Each structure stands twice: as structure tokens, then as C-alpha cells.
Amino acid sequence: MFTDSDAVFAGFCSGCIASANCALRRNHTSASLQAAITSFIHTVKYQPVVFALPPPIGSVMVEYTLVKQLLLLNLYSPASWPSFAVLLDGLMTANTTVIAAYVNGLLQSSGDSSTAADSGEALTGIKCSDVRPAGRATSLAGIRPVVEGRHRLSQMVGDAADYLPIECAQWRMPAREQYAGGFAGIRTRGRLLVIGNAFDPVTPLVAAQNVSKGFERSVLLKHLGYGVCSPFLPSFYPLRVVWNRIGADGSLQHSSLAQGSLCTARATRAYFVNGTLPEPGTECRVDVDRFAGNDGWDEVMSHFNTGNATATATRSVAHRVARRWEAGRHLVGMGPLESLVRTARLGVMDKL
């Protein structure tokens, strides 16, 4: 899962240094920026920071788990990287003006968050029902090797979602339709097109390669982009809330849509319209900068014939997908800072 996560984080840092649209780039190289962010995360692990923000926000606490989850969530979509860089710079420099402005913007745009409850059991039920008996355990010691294995895959985010394997280790309701067969030598009626992202924080390219190897005659197209989903959501939505909503309302999907690519779009259209596949080893570059602040799909889709009804419909769908993040502000629920604000008034910290 986290095989390429650190490479995506490195891409965030190198993209920041190369862009004028990154608040973190001043007086840094890519390596020094990585070191600075890592140092900040380690600092708040043992010394959480409390920020006293002006009314009506109040005091909020920034600690290790929050920052790790925010980092992982924002690696999902480069379209969020400029705004996340502003927020992260504000946190690292203790700039309460920047933090307050960000939180106020979030609170004003998130609407009535009380209507979007975090259905935490949904993710557990979906993922844990597919866990094989070998993934279950009766004690923390029994599941520790799995958790530690995830940590070894990624220094930056390997421990950002430890709750999931620990919860699944105790799950006692396996799905009836759980697949117990193999994934090799599968021959489908039609040949499959498999698309894998080169820099994906949670569904790495090696997984796409394994899928392609399992399906005979399939072709893997390597999408040379960062991230895993589009549209993006505001930086402070909690990781568990977002994961619980993936696929439920169409606002997030694991896909190759995080960065637009005319090459990938043409290959996908050729497959669905004509049944043709790209040549083995095909790689498609993306047509948007990592810190552009958008996913680039509007520009990509402008290359398709607007007079053709099918192309027009395709552009319409792509446009709605590219803009769905605005609706996502109202669909997903309160963000960590907003929940921190509410619970701080009660003297209780929200553990997300």
C-alpha cells in the first residue's frame, strides 16, 4: 500500500522548490525541505503545539497524528498541494494569522457539517470483511508484524492509518463472497487495459504491474503522474472521514485522474471506443504542473472534438469531476480543525 508514498512526498518537496506557487520553497532545497517537514512532525510527536486563534475559533492543538493524517490525505491529490503548503508553512512557523485565515475559510465554506456524520463502521466493514484468517489476531502482539511492515514501507505515512489493520485483526464477520482463488493466468473474453500511476501514495505502480501480470493479454499503461484521486478536498478534512466516503458519493475514487494527461485520455478513449490497446511499455506524461492548483483535466478535454455528441458528453462529465471538490466541502463533514475547535470548548481533544 505505501510502497511509493515516500517518493510522492519527495515529489511534493521537489515540486514545491521548482514552483513559485509554493509557500514552503523559500531558503530551501528539496532535501532540506523534506528534512524540515520531517523534523516538525517529530517535534509535535512529543511536544504538541497549541495555537490560540482569535474568536470565534479559540484554541486548537496540532499533534503528531493530525499532521501525519493531513500529509497522507493531501498526497492523494496534487491539486491541493499549494493550499496545503500554505497551511503547513503556517503551522511550522507558528503563523497564527495564516492558520486563522485558513480555518475561517474552511468554516465558512463547509456549511452545516453536523449533517454529514462520520460513519466509521462502513470502512471497517468493507475492508475487514475481506481479510483472510491469516490477517486476524487475538492480541496486539499477533498483529504487530503487519503494522511494523507498513511502517517499514514508508517513513512519512506508514503509521498514519495503523487503526485499520488493528481493527481488522479483530473482525469476526468474513464476507460470504470473499474470493479465495488465485490471481494468475486469468484469461478474459476481451483484453484489459490496466492503468497505473507512477507516483501513487496508496495504490502503487507495483500493484498495477501485478494485476496486469495476472490477466493474460492485458497491457499496462504507465501514467506518469502524482496522486490517486480527483477532485481534491480541503486540506483539513480528517483521513477517516474521507476514506469512509470514498465511492459512496462519487467525490473520491482511486484512479488515474489526479493529474490530467492527453496521452492517457486518448489511450482510454481508444480502448473503449475501438477496443484497441496501447503498445506494451507505453508511458504517458501528464499535462499539468504539480503545483498548478488544479488537476488539468479542463485543458486536456479541450483537445477533444466539441461537435461530437459523445465527446461533448465526455467533456461535460470531466468538467463536473474536475469541479466536484467544491461540492465535497459540503459532502464530507467537519474537518479536524473545526472538530478541534468544537471539542476544545468542551476541554476534550478529538482523536479523529
Give, region by region, the residue ranges found by the protein language model.
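C-terminal subdomain of alpha/beta-hydrolase-fold enzymes, centered on the catalytic histidine
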Residues: 1-352
